[in-house]
Design a protein with these regions (language model features):
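C-terminal active-site subregion of NodB/CE4 polysaccharide deacetylases
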Residues: 110-111, 117, 123-218, 231-247, ...
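Generic recognition of cysteine residues
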Residues: 17, 46, 51-53, 263, ...
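Short loop/turn hinge sites at secondary-structure boundaries
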Residues: 87, 120, 224-225
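Gram-positive cell-envelope targeting signals
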Residues: 1-101, 105-108, 113, 125, ...
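Short, glycine/charge-rich beta-strand/loop segments that flank catalytic centers
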Residues: 217-225
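Metal-dependent polysaccharide deacetylase catalytic core of the NodB/CE4 family, i.e.
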Residues: 161-181, 226-229, 238-245, 252-419, ...
Length: 504
């Protein structure tokens, strides 16, 4: 498998997935796994694995009892008594048969129902309860249906035109290597958010009742009363006190120029198929763990499923000139391509990387993430000439779109620079018309206001708010009060930042 080859490349031993032998906790409780780059360590790691496996085998029955608790012990005792009364020899593991009743179809079904309800998918929960997998005689089914119907009566429809949209860039793991006293370091300090800041933002927004939705949950193109196709608002129903919001992350490409800057350098899949990040520390040691938005958000939603509406996660905005997600997949890295750039370091594994990225984007889609174009070369679409914009987006369609699991209909403008003003797009707008011809229907610019959403024709436009160093500092150090509806910036701002924070 490709992932196995990648692991061998770094001299790793064993699997990494969830809470296994190689997991290490940091002070913030984030899960990490250190990858030993020195071959001499591998022998000791192997010995450690063998010892732990022997201990784990000996303690298996004990752990099963802990996990199943009194119900299993009771079931085992009942099974033993039944065997004794019938004259049968008692099973060495009498709870083996009884455990089937503990995890029967109805139990599994109710767990799925609870998950759907926790993420506000009440219709899905009712469908599950009405399906063939339920034991209709089980009183829990009727009770659960009654509970769901009672909750549905209290739901409040969200006004899609008052839904805020926040965004981030690649998160900073080591500010000491990122926020240097250089032009680039000052730029990072302005536009980037640290890992502790992001974690605090998630926690505070959750505590304030915010619920993460996808941009496609806001509206979709459908026929109106006259048979015309129009972008029409959808219903988002949430309990009282809950507030919908959208999240996105720009430049999820892990550019070459960011190498060694204290940030993650790629996304990959662990042995359970879950997205994690690769990070190299100052000593050159490679770590796998929660070093950027995706795995941190995944863990937060796993712990707080009611933070996500029907499993929605963030929009990942991709350019193309350095490849995507940390892999140099663009044709400019391909010596066999007529568009190969000799100034680029060629990627001899480009086809393998492209195949792996397709696998990765499919996994991210199934995990609730959406993808957006951020142009190919991070161009200012609001300012450049039409022909230059066409050439740029055509390169994105050629090099990035084929790596995605579905057609991309979201455009997140670089620099927040829209191709139109505040008035609705019209067919006279040639830039919009060309983007629309490629299938783009959702367009995002940047604005510091709490919300701005516009629909018309076959488009939805939404402004985004930057929760970066500059915006945090303007509230924290200058009293701007632009973020108080979301967070308490005094408890979010990372004191490791150099101040004041200027605009890049």
């Amino acid at each position: 498998m490709k992932l196995q080859k990648r692991k061998k490349q770094y001299g790793t031993v064993g699997k990494y997935c969830g809470r296994d032998l190689y997991i290490k906790r940091t002070g913030r409780g984030r899960l990490q796994r250190r990858i030993g780059l020195r071959r001499g360590k591998n022998r000791y790691l192997c010995l450690a694995i063998i010892c732990v496996c022997l201990l784990a085998t000996g303690g298996l029955l004990f752990e099963m009892r802990i996990l199943l608790g009194d119900r299993e012990i009771s079931a085992m005792a009942s099974a033993a008594e039944s065997d004794s009364a019938s004259g049968k020899e008692a099973s060495s593991f009498p709870g083996e048969k009884a455990s089937l009743s503990l995890f029967d179809k109805t139990d599994e079904l109710l767990a799925q129902v609870d998950r759907a309800v926790s993420q506000y998918d009440y219709d899905r929960a009712v469908e599950l309860l009405a399906g063939n997998g339920a034991d209709k005689e089980d009183p829990r089914i009727a009770e659960k249906l009654s509970d769901i119907e009672a909750v549905k009566k209290t739901l409040v429809e969200q006004d899609i035109y008052r839904i805020t949209h926040i965004f981030f860039h690649i998160l900073v793991e080591d500010p000491g290597r990122t926020f240097l006293d250089t032009a680039q370091g000052k730029g990072y300090n302005s536009v980037m958010t640290t890992v502790p800041e992001f974690e605090a933002i998630l926690t505070q927004m959750y505590q304030r009742g915010y619920v993460l939705v996808g941009i496609h949950d806001l509206a979709e193109v459908s026929e109106d009363e006259t048979g015309m196709e129009q972008m029409r608002a959808k219903k988002i129903l949430l309990p009282p006190g809950k507030k919908a919001f959208v999240m996105s992350q720009d430049d999820v490409n892990y550019y070459e120029y960011m190498e060694g800057s204290g940030c993650a350098r790629k996304i990959l899949l662990d042995d359970c198929g879950k997205p994690v990040c690769e990070y190299m520390d100052q000593d050159g040691t490679v770590w796998i763990g929660e070093y950027d938005l995706v795995p941190i958000l995944d863990r937060f939603v796993e712990e707080h499923p009611d933070f996500s509406y029907r499993g929605a996660k963030a929009i990942l905005a991709l350019t193309g000139y350095n490849g995507v997600l940390g892999y140099r997949t663009d044709e400019t890295y391909d010596p066999a391509s007529p568009n190969y750039n000799p100034d680029m370091k060629p990627n001899p594994n480009i086809e393998e990387d492209r195949a792996y990225v397709r696998e990765l984007t499919q996994a991210l889609k199934e995990d609730g993430y959406e993808f957006a174009s951020h142009s190919w070369g991070h161009r200012d679409y609001g300012k450049i000439e039409l022909e230059h914009m066409k050439a740029d987006i055509d390169r994105w369609e050629k090099n990035v779109a084929p790596l995605l699991p579905a057609p991309c209909d979201i455009m997140i403008y670089p620099f927040g620079s829209d191709v139109g003003d505040w008035r609705p797009y019209t067919e006279e707008n040639e830039k919009y018309r060309y983007l629309q011809s490629l299938g783009f229907m959702y367009f995002c610019n940047v604005d510091s206001r709490p919300y701005w959403v516009e629909t018309g024709g076959q488009f939805l436009r939404q402004a985004r708010r930057n929760l970066d160093g500059y915006r945090l500092w303007m509230d924290y150090g200058c009293g701007a009060n632009r973020l108080s509806d979301l967070i308490d910036v005094n408890t979010v701002f990372d004191a490791r930042r150099p101040t004041p924070v200027g605009w890049k």
